[in-house]
Amino acid sequence: MSEFHRLYFDELLFDFPDLVKVQKDSYASFVGGGDTVFSISDIFASVFPVNDGYGRASLEFVSCRMGEPKHDEYGCVERGITYSAPLRAILRLVVFGDETSGEGSEGVSTEPAVKDVREQEIYMGDIPIMSKNGTFIINGVERVVVSQMHRAPGVFFDNDKARSISGKLNYIARIIPYRGSWLDFEFDAKDVLYFRIDKKRKLPVTFLLRALGLSNKDIFAQFCEVSECRLTKDGKWTVCFVPEKFKGVRLQYDLINAETGELVLAKGNRISIVLARNLYAKGLRYCYMDLEVMKDMYLADDLVSTKGEVLLPHGTKLTKEHVAKLEFLDVDSIKLVELKGNYVFSTVLQYDCSYEEAMLSIYRVVRPGEIPSVESAEKLFESLFFSPERYDLLNVGRIRLNAKFNLSHDESLTVLTKEDIFCTVKELALLQREVGDVDDIDHLGNRRVRSVGEFMDNQFRIGLVRMAKVIVENMATADFDTVMPCEMINSKILGAVIREFFMSSALSQFMDQTNPLSEITHKRRISALGPGGLNRGRAGFEVRDVHTTHYGRICATETPEGATIGLINSLAIYAKINKYGFIETPYRYVRDGRVTDEVTYLSAIDEIKANICQASVRVDEEGYIVDDLVYCRRNYENVFIPRSEVQFADVSAKQIVSVAASLIPFLENDDANRALMGSNMQRQAVPLIMPEAPLVGTGMEGYVARGSGAVIVAKRAGVVQYIDARNIVVASESKDDFWIDSYTLCKFRKSNHNTCIHQRCVVHQGQRVKKGDILADGPAIQKGELALGRNLVVAFLSWRGYNFEDSVVISSNVVRDDLFTSVHLEGFECVVRDTRLGPEEITRDVSGVAEEFLHCLDEFGIACVGANVEAGDVLVGKVTPKSSSPVTPEEKLLRAIFGEKAIDVKDSSLYLPPGVSGCVVDVKVLQRRGIEKVGRALLIEKQAIDAEKTRRDHELAVLTNYIYSLLKEMLVGKVALSTLAPISKGDLITEEALEKIDRENWWKISVDGISSIKLLRQRFVDRFDEINKTYEENFEKIRGDDDLAQGVLMVVKVFVAVKHTLQPGDKMSGRHGNKGVISRIVPAEDMPYLADGTPVDIILNPLGVPSRMNVGQILETHLGWAAYNLGKKISKLLDEGNYSEVKSLVLEIYKNDRKMMARLNEMTDAEIVEYSRSLRGGVPVAASVFEGPKTDEIERLLVLAGKDPSGQEVLYDGVTGEKFDRKVTVGCKYMLKLHHLVNDKIHARSIGSYSLITQQPLGGKSHFGGQRFGEMECWALQAYGATFALQEMLTIKSDDVVGRVNVYDSIVRGDNDFYYGVPESFNVMMNELRALCLNVEFCSDLEKKKDFGDLALAASGQ
């Protein structure tokens, strides 16, 4: 038991999934095919075949394949190229002749005869490949494609609150496809129903219905509520009583039961829905209809006599005369439609039109300015909603439409149907009558996630469609007798479209690579922004807010601060995305009151009708729920229900939070705002050179480390055969299936955010490892657990004002021991170009540069690895040819001394910029193809090849030793059938005899079973050749040239490691949103100290806790103090040799951790003591989110460690030695150093560049800017009346260009007379006024008086 085990206070019942599975599965479905994302072959099949349009030829798709990438992932980063693989497709060109083949129904040939068929494999372009960690390498930079949350295809119903005038809500419906035109329906203030296509000008819905081929009779049948009136024997008309039709109606006649003649309700009463249902329940089925009410109603069907004669056509409005004559007409029943509430019918009556008018009107709206015909309008309308080429709902949209309207269409039908439109209109009409509810657009059942595979699908399709258009153009001019398929393909089109997406899309982002947590969080991010998404400027509060359906799917805590809050979210730790793009979360089945271990995933739609209890529900040993009434969620409301009705249970209390939030212990005790900050600031933590896992963790640290890809994990179980600083070789122990896995460690590799990626081996030679074991730690990882910071002894105390306003006081011991020292890599690039005057040259011989700045260069002019460099040092010496000019006497002298070179070139070397100093850790030299490698490039190539040869030799040595060990087992104990000194024929072969023979000669010994030995030798030779072949390919890649930009001959990259120690001004934080800036580093002897003389490491302000309401940090401090002192106690007992007490103490610590106790009970006393040695630094504990230790458990551990259960200690002032007045909260807390380093922010300059317009210093460190005397500084001098100082500041000391030169001359001459000129900023202001047609000129006092007098006379009109 080599690794330490955290003390858990809960049980992990459900293991965590692959944390970057979202990215990997989505891209895999694009490459190999999936449920919603089409594969590459499917997209080819949907675009091809491409015909020339004249029936002469057709280009068909046969198959495609992806090749192998030219370089590995790191090789692409080094060379600044894209990690991609070539895509090749086999296309078949079918050429048709003039004659035709086949016969139609009348014996006439119908199909053209095939004249020729030509197949060819064609290079279609390079497709970026996803790395094993779920990222893409584009132009040498790691990028992540962020998943996007968008509105799911389908129909949505809402009300338009913004356009409501009278207080009555007008409802709208919108059918949104995945690809194609939007169809909107809306009511105006007069209850007229309109529709829009793609948000263009609206038209009455009559036009759409007519275009769909509906007559008035069809409209009555589809949309109108028809009342059938029957004539009784006594000559009265009756109508069927339907409660929904009478809801809200004020009676205009007495309501009389037609069956009993009883008066049910008197005239004038208003019928509510409750009253109507009660009347129906009491037996009211038919009631008498007043003839006056039938007036102004419309006939829903032709009024036909008993003889079949049409008396009145359908759609006729009944008048007084019609009503009066009804009893005399020969009819016994009529079907009537009331205008009120039948919005579709009323719209048709107001805006009626013919089929042709409807088609032409729709065409004019969609394509204004064009002259339509009925045929073209029909084609356009058909293509808008009913053509698979232009309209696509996806299977998601079809499923949602089927579920909404109870339809049964197949999933493969992804275009609209007439039935979909009819159902939408009917549902909207019901909503306008206040029947039903609108959709919640923020419900996760109405929003789906698009991932990288879907984006690639779309881009690939766009590229192929563009390519198809080019193919058609090329076919028009092609000679089909000789043309080949490759001549019609432009392979750059597809690559350009995909490259444009990765380079310019808002969802293809520069990966946050500050630490492993920031990487994994970026890959699990879900954005509502981007193409087709929301706009941060117009997104309202509702869409940003936490929704009930986010439970277990989207983290309610982690989101950015600022303008994008709520629009960018993170997946919850257990959440996954199903094949339709909906987010699902896992639940355990509950059957007959028993919580089982069977797990299922539910989407937000599936969860609505389920009864779900919490993970913390009380159960007995067999899993049965103890309580009779259980607190559950049903339809997103909290209710108490009987345990027999519970259907599901949460898998874990932490399933509602994201990866970053799950790393915060005691999260439940923090305010939500501070928890948000804590989640975000963990991603800003800088990896330290000596990382330390937190004593108080959550148990998620190991899962995050593995999921991030920063560690090296064993692919298979085996034995570690070889280890050095860069390589680990693991081999199998199996005799039947032998393999060798070689792992290469990253050393001083630069991340996207200039942090150092450095891996360290954690196994030893001969160690047995299992599949999934960690072989090497990465940055910010210790023993396979995430380690973003350090555990410090903290005191919450005000100390001489230095921790005012969240400032932090640090002990000098922290700096001395390099606890928060980090290494950052800065990359510098020098490009050698071929100029029109000749090529640039890299050399150490740079004229005009002092030798002290060239000390780190080798003989080739490039910095040596390991050299310490300071600001101003030359990293790469480079000279550039310069044009000829008149030669000065000094240049003539240089020419005479140094030759022609002295005047022909200028210095263009790469210098280390100001503010940077460090050690050169790596140099890369890239040379253009076709140029012979010389100098340092050959040396670097040789080093790389030697490193590969060393790896190869180690693998071959492992293989050889293994094979010869098997051969030895086959030979020993057998009788030799041949003689090979010192073994004679007939001798029994022994190990001693074999050792005297060279191993290469063992194959010559003949024994029984020689066939198995020959088979072993063949396996050995094959595996040997395979390893050699692999490394020969690697050698060729190393020796290969690089593809550089036009005109570039060579690129030299120099990487400098910069060491950042902790200093005042650096930003630090905890995990609870508690952040501050270091104000002072105090000598350890002046820091407050404990009774045993231990000084505290850090002092925090206690006032920062209650107002921020992040009490979790106090609980962490107390639990950390217990864990820290338990480690000290164990260490003391080990040093004393009191092993029995060590064992009893360890057992007492872990007594509530069932899994750990089971492991300890299986261990011997010696093994327990050996394990306890790993606890010297403290007993690591896991305070899981919502399942952490209670107060009594923390107090138990504090007492066990021999500390006050209050968590407070007596402190002494390190300066005076006096005891503080009261006890102080002291503990062990995990602190992080954030990447807001003071070295990156503060700079100074004495001289530098000026702005060309204002002649004032530039601003900011990036421009090497300086200080300018600004507006507020002028106010300060004005306030003191310092006129002369102000005049100097605004002129010669600022932007008076001429004055600056004159002052310099005056100083040189010893003259104290300064002459002030006009500041350049004043000239800028005058030019701006002139741009406004206001001329400003300088003039003397006399001229001013004369000009003002003339102006006054002109103004008076004299």
UniProtKB/Swiss-Prot annotation:
Disulfide bonds: none annotated. PROSITE patterns: RNA_POL_BETA. It catalyses: RNA(n) + a ribonucleoside 5'-triphosphate = RNA(n+1) + diphosphate. It holds the Pfam family RNA_pol_Rpb2_7. SUPFAM superfamilies: beta and beta-prime subunits of DNA dependent RNA-polymerase. Keywords: DNA-directed RNA polymerase, Nucleotidyltransferase, Transcription, Transferase. Its EC number is 2.7.7.6. One of its GO terms (biological process) is DNA-templated transcription. GO terms for cellular component: DNA-directed RNA polymerase complex. Gene3D superfamilies: 2.40.50.100, 2.40.50.150, 3.90.1100.10, 6.10.140.1670, DNA-directed RNA polymerase, beta subunit, external 1 domain, DNA-directed RNA polymerase, subunit 2, domain 6, RNA polymerase alpha subunit dimerisation domain, RNA polymerase Rpb2, domain 2. It is an enzyme of class 2 (transferase). GO terms for molecular function: DNA binding; DNA-directed RNA polymerase activity; ribonucleoside binding. The keyword Transcription applies. PANTHER family: DNA-DIRECTED RNA POLYMERASE I SUBUNIT 2 (PTHR20856). The RNAP catalytic core consists of 2 alpha, 1 beta, 1 beta' and 1 omega subunit. When a sigma factor is associated with the core the holoenzyme is formed, which can initiate transcription. Belongs to the RNA polymerase beta chain family. DNA-dependent RNA polymerase catalyzes the transcription of DNA into RNA using the four ribonucleoside triphosphates as substrates. This is DNA-directed RNA polymerase subunit beta. It comes from Neorickettsia sennetsu (strain ATCC VR-367 / Miyayama) (Ehrlichia sennetsu). The gene is rpoB.
